[in-house]
């Protein structure tokens, strides 16, 4: 083969694709008459989408800021509410403490008032008793009538006339009294001292009679043992009875029909302290 045969043929010798009236397949869309409007529409769509995204992003930011602000407001309101609740709880606790202290104070005052009322009532009672005692003292002439001797709880009258025992008993009864009755060594000492300076005998309210001849006082009570000892003969018994008398502080027994002075006795009119 010759070298000339290897030379490249000029382009004109090659078949022209344009001349054949055929277009390349890859460039068919670009040459379409709808390409430009479609591109514009797509761009507008993309721009609208971008604007929508931007607007949505801005709205999202606004919503986020609003949510943050609302959250902050809620937190602030919650803190305020917690403070108010705490303050209310503290106020309730303080109120309860004040009520407790006030209740204790009222109870203390009521107790003091009750004590003062009781004391006032007691003072009023004492005042009334004092007034009553003063009234009694105004009308009080003494524990014993005139000419009577006062000793302890009793009054004693030494008679100025002599009678037998029964008549002496009647005289004492007429004075709302009885013949002398000795119940204690203290009473005995007073009578012994009162009669020690007189030589006259004085009937006592002590006698013994049938059937057992026991020594009995007018009211029927027996003589206390060892209270005093009889002087002289005491064993003799008389039909009219044996009666006791006291003379110069000593006690004797004699026939009741004999005459002697007497000692009457009755309760003293003592003021009673109430």
Curated annotation (Swiss-Prot):
InterPro entries: C-type_lectin-like, C-type_lectin-like/link_sf, CTDL_fold, Ly49_N, NKR-like_CTLD, OxLDL_rcpt1-like
Transmembrane region(s): 32-54
Organism name: Oryctolagus cuniculus (Rabbit)
Coiled coil feature spans: 84-139
Lipidation sites (S-palmitoyl cysteine): 36, 46
UniProt main location, coarse: membrane
Record's note on what induces expression: Overexpressed in atherosclerotic lesions.
Gene Ontology biological-process entries: immune system process; inflammatory response; leukocyte cell-cell adhesion; lipoprotein metabolic process
Cytoplasmic face residues: 1-31
Record-annotated disulphide pairs: 144-155, 172-264, 243-256
Location of the protein in the cell: Cell membrane; Membrane raft; Secreted
Renumbered residue ranges of the record's region Disordered: 1-25
Its job: Receptor that mediates the recognition, internalization and degradation of oxidatively modified low density lipoprotein (oxLDL) by vascular endothelial cells. OxLDL is a marker of atherosclerosis that induces vascular endothelial cell activation and dysfunction, resulting in pro-inflammatory responses, pro-oxidative conditions and apoptosis.
Membrane topology term: Lipid-anchor; Single-pass type II membrane protein
CDD domains: CLECT_NK_receptors_like (cd03593)
Single GO MF annotation: low-density lipoprotein particle receptor activity
PROSITE patterns hit by this protein: C_TYPE_LECTIN_2
Gene Ontology CC terms, in alphabetical order: extracellular region; membrane raft; plasma membrane; receptor complex
Highest taxon in the source lineage: Eukaryota
Annotated glycan sites: 73, 139
Recorded name of the encoding gene: OLR1
Name this polypeptide is given: Oxidized low-density lipoprotein receptor 1
Pfam families: Lectin_C, Ly49
Entry comment, domain topic: The cytoplasmic region is required for subcellular sorting on the cell surface. The C-type lectin domain mediates the recognition and binding of oxLDL.
């Amino acid at each position: 083969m010759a070298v000339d045969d290897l030379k490249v043929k000029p382009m004109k010798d090659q078949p022209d694709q344009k001349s054949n009236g055929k277009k390349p397949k890859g460039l068919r869309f670009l040459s379409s008459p709808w390409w430009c409007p479609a591109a514009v529409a797509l761009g507008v769509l993309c721009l609208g989408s971008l604007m929508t995204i931007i607007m949505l992003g801005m709205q999202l930011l606004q919503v986020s800021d609003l949510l943050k602000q609302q959250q902050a407001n809620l937190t602030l309101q919650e803190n305020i509410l917690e403070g108010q609740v705490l303050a209310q709880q503290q106020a309730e606790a303080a109120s309860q403490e004040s009520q407790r202290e006030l209740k204790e104070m009222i109870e203390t005052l009521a107790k003091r008032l009750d004590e003062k009322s009781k004391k006032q009532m007691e003072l009023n009672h004492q005042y009334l008793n004092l007034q009553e005692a003063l009234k009694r003292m105004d009308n009080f002439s003494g524990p014993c009538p005139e000419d009577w001797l006062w000793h302890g709880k009793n009054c004693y009258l030494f008679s100025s006339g002599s009678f037998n025992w029964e008549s002496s008993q009647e005289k004492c009864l007429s004075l709302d009294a009885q013949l002398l009755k000795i119940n204690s060594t203290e009473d005995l000492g007073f009578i012994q001292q009162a009669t020690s300076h007189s030589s006259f005998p004085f009937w006592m309210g002590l006698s013994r009679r049938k059937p057992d001849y026991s020594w009995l006082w007018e009211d029927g009570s027996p003589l206390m043992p060892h209270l005093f000892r009889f002087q002289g003969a005491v064993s003799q018994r008389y039909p009219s009875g044996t009666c006791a008398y006291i003379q110069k502080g000593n006690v004797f027994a004699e026939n009741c029909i004999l005459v002697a002075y007497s000692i009457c006795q009755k309760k003293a009119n003592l003021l009673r302290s109430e």
